[in-house]
Amino acid sequence: FISPPSKGTSLTFKCKVGITVIWLLLGAVLGYLFLVIAFCLPTNRMRSHLESTPDVFYNGSVALVKDDLATHLDYLTEATILSEAIYDGNESPFVKAAAIYSVLPPEGDENWSYRKLISSLSATNESAHGPYDRYWQGQLAILRPLLLLLDYKDILRLNTLVQLFLMLWIAHLLSCHSLTHLLFPLALMFCSLTPIATGICLQYTPCFLIMAIGCVVLLRHTNIINKFNWLFFLSLGMATSYFDFLTYPLVTLGIPLILYLQLETSSPSQRFFQITTCSLSWGIGYIGFWAEKWLLGSVILQENLFSEAYNSIILRSSHETLGQTITYMATLKNNLQAYDLRTWKILWLLLFLVTIVLALHRHCLTLHNILAFSPLCLVACMPFVWYYFTQNHSYIHFGFTHRELSITFFALSCFLVQLCNSAHIE
């Protein structure tokens, strides 16, 4: 929580702790109320807008391009989200917002995702249902109102347009900051997220939008963020905990943090300090806001969600799955295979070669310059640390957890481009 004196404010440590606690509590109250309001909305129209949707899920999870992991669409979770959005049981909105119920599909020969959505569309008050109360699932506070106006296909098209618009806005803001040399790393990062998939899968949307909106806010209000960087990253962590379904959450820290470092003129040691404090703030927001959901759910539902959450954390961070031992290298292999394409290999080879040639030609390949931009290399390592502590989850769900590596792509490409763009320093 402590920022370097040159970039910080006059707020004391105790004051920052107090603001953090108030911010977390206020966020939890507002987040819960948004969900309560969303569950007060009528469901009939939402269901009618999803009547043509189940056929999309008939074959379950798919890859848009055969054998291309990066285009994988997790329709199992997608069907769960849609089923939760149209749940219409007898419980009060306050209970629904805490429990996040969905109808349990009956046994059958069809794919689980298809059965899940079909049974949800035809459900009655007596239909079997179950909660998914470990997560906030704040995406429902937006999805339910949208389903009153749009069908599933309309929402996906809107999502694609919003994501593209945000990336173009970031590119424009980089130009306004005279950071046009970062446009190539931005494009590289955008491609590594496989926007063709993130645009048409609601599950992949929250982290992308939080990351992109965070970058826009950072670039538009740089002076304010410099003064309150801890609060900015705390808010990003809270938003990620609220909206995300544990897909690739680290990008909401890593990508804005990389941009933040590009806007800084401080020394490498100060930048390492900023990486630590900003990451700590994000982590407190992410974990703290999640813990608030468990506390809130435990009180409202009269259940011990902390016990369930603890068991889930132990499972997701374990080195086993279905009795099989997982190695860290196996987890890395699963996630790296999404980028095991000739296109990426050639692109990175060319980038390294061009960097070396230009750096030598411009006489900027110096130890001083390398050390000046070395904090970016630390950020580039973040996904690998994340994979180590979430081996079970990252090994199983590599179809979307591989997107954490977009942080590495962005950080390394920024490092190389900055090295070429730097002036020679004796």
Annotated model-derived regions:
Residues 3-15, 219-229, 261-273, 360-367, ...:
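Membrane-interface junctions at the ends of membrane-embedded or membrane-associated helices
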Residues 141, 187-210, 237-240:
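Aromatic- and kink-enriched transmembrane "portal" helix at the membrane-lumen/periplasm boundary
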Residues 141-159:
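Juxtamembrane segments of multi-pass membrane glycosylation machinery
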Residues 160-184:
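Transmembrane-helix motifs of polytopic, lipid-linked glycan transferases
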Residues 229-257, 274-288:
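Membrane-interface alpha helices of multi-pass inner-membrane proteins
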Residues 275-355:
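Membrane-lumen/periplasm interface segments of specific transmembrane helices
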Residues 356-380:
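Membrane-interface helix-loop-helix junctions at transmembrane boundaries of multi-pass membrane enzymes
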Residues 396-419:
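Hydrophobic/aromatic-rich transmembrane helices and adjacent perimembrane loops
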